[in-house]
């Protein structure tokens, strides 16, 4: 049985929920889902330039959990860019955000 997911502090609320390659109809694209906590981890580490320990404290997760989130998110983003896939950002669960 999997452990219950600990609520994470998520401050990022993107204006769009889907990014896709230009000129390709959405129905023809494979779909990759990016979780809100993965996007928040990317924002803190890659956009704001925080160290992983600082970002983990801000999200209220362990440093290892943050590292796993960043790794998964980067893989998904690169996969979409290189293989022309649509990147969907999952809706934020109100229970897991501040």
Curated annotation (Swiss-Prot):
Secretion signal span: none
The organism's place on the tree of life at top rank: Bacteria
PANTHER family: PTHR37478, UPF0251 PROTEIN TK0562 (PTHR37478:SF2)
Family, as annotated: Belongs to the UPF0251 family.
Protein name (database record): UPF0251 protein VC_A0091
